[in-house]
Amino acid sequence: MSRAYDLVVIGAGSGGLEAGWNAASLHKKRVAVIDLQKHHGPPHYAALGGTCVNVGCVPKKLMVTGANYMDTIRESAGFGWELDRESVRPNWKALIAAKNKAVSGINDSYEGMFADTEGLTFHQGFGALQDNHTVLVRESADPNSAVLETLDTEYILLATGSWPQHLGIEGDDLCITSNEAFYLDEAPKRALCVGGGYISIEFAGIFNAYKARGGQVDLAYRGDMILRGFDSELRKQLTEQLRANGINVRTHENPAKVTKNADGTRHVVFESGAEADYDVVMLAIGRVPRSQTLQLDKAGVEVAKNGAIKVDAYSKTNVDNIYAIGDVTDRVMLTPVAINEGAAFVDTVFANKPRATDHTKVACAVFSIPPMGVCGYVEEDAAKKYDQVAVYESSFTPLMHNISGSTYKKFMVRIVTNHADGEVLGVHMLGDSSPEIIQSVAICLKMGAKISDFYNTIGVHPTSAEELCSMRTPAYFYQKGKRVEKIDSNL
């Protein structure tokens, strides 16, 4: 039988839009895309472009860029700029207004895409399954809410993303998440960022730059070191630099209770027994797949305990015509990954060219101050897979910071290789421009570059990136999973 649509996509994020546009434009398919609203902001925050465009990568990068001017202004004196720093004031409202305008422009461009693409239509509401070929567009997340539309389709693509987690403690409702942080009326003078991941660290940097004078930013993390899963030496160095910038990093610390003071501020009691007052408590303790309102049981779609939709290498669920991509599958929660998965889905289903996204050697960045850029294995994981692993490392003060007054800003580079053949397994960097540098490095890793390819390449001088071309001697090794100073050829 002929169905009304070839494809219904639930979720207008980066992955969903990539799949929808490719299917309609490249393969002339009839595609419906469902999401909660067209433009960013409350009440739903999700809108055209998904988390990345509306309450994620894009606005965050703009705000971090603004925050970096704090150091630029301070450091300019070392380069001969005479500024009256007492007269320099951050304007949070101006930042948010500019950010909102930029994001609205992207929302508008996506609206234009729907208007200009034959066969591609947008449907506003909550998407939910009725069966494996029928999608309901509901008025709200309530499964009993009014049905606005019923869409009959051959294929279904689930691309609903992820959502910030809450702590589940008393006073949880008095805290905000990154969603609300993008729309605060004013920068908090006293802020607590809860969590040791990249979102918490990035917002700590933003709040630290825009806070009123005399303010304080605390970052509380229950573990012993921030950024679990990243290179351990970079984590240590970043912590030192965050503290040098004035951020109070509190490890082995977690809120136990939050109450509201008479003046509207928040009183936090920590698990350690310590207490403090804040204007804003922002939770950034992780994100969970957003699948709860999809009524997946109606079509028999399998999910993991955390709500992640189970898929195979080609993003297909256990139901033959239903696929899922992006954060909702809890594979690699990065926008470019979701985009690649969306394109691969269309290649597989509509182009008859089955393609699985390669989730290895994916570069990523932490837009902390200073930023981090990484790609590939950390040394501990490499040592579990390879018999002999070599670790190269370098830490230095970039040229500019010899006169900027920020000599504490070290640039750190660490390279992990398979010592048996020299293949570069991972590159990890901390310092200015790391996110830009790591993109080129990722191409090298994808091509199977060896450490000799790095040091036989002539560097660009004077840059921090040229250090990648100067690292010839390993600092230490791993052999049979154990760290050693040199390789024992008898083992």
UniProtKB/Swiss-Prot annotation:
Its cofactor is FAD. GO terms for cellular component: cytosol; mitochondrion. Optimum pH is 7.5-8.0. One of its GO terms (biological process) is glutathione metabolic process. It is found in: Cytoplasm. Pfam families: Pyr_redox_2 (PF07992), Pyr_redox_dim (PF02852). FAD binds at residues 35-51. It catalyses: trypanothione + NADP(+) = trypanothione disulfide + NADPH + H(+). Its EC number is 1.8.1.12. Keywords: Cytoplasm, Disulfide bond, FAD, Flavoprotein, NADP, Oxidoreductase, Redox-active center. Disulfide bonds join C52-C57. The N-terminus is blocked. SUPFAM superfamilies: FAD/NAD(P)-binding domain (SSF51905), FAD/NAD-linked reductases, dimerisation (C-terminal) domain (SSF55424), Nucleotide-binding domain (SSF51971). Binds 1 FAD per subunit. Coiled coil: none annotated. The active site is at H461 (proton acceptor). Transmembrane segments: none annotated. InterPro entries: FAD/NAD-bd_sf, FAD/NAD-binding_dom, FAD/NAD-linked_Rdtase_dimer_sf, GSHR/TRXR-like, Pyr_nuc-diS_OxRdtase, Pyr_nucl-diS_OxRdtase_dimer, Pyr_OxRdtase_I_AS, Trypnth_redctse. It comes from the Eukaryota. GO terms for molecular function: flavin adenine dinucleotide binding; glutathione-disulfide reductase (NADPH) activity; trypanothione-disulfide reductase (NADPH) activity. Homodimer. Belongs to the class-I pyridine nucleotide-disulfide oxidoreductase family. The active site is a redox-active disulfide bond. This is Trypanothione reductase. It comes from Crithidia fasciculata. The lineage of its organism: Eukaryota, Discoba, Euglenozoa, Kinetoplastea, Metakinetoplastina.
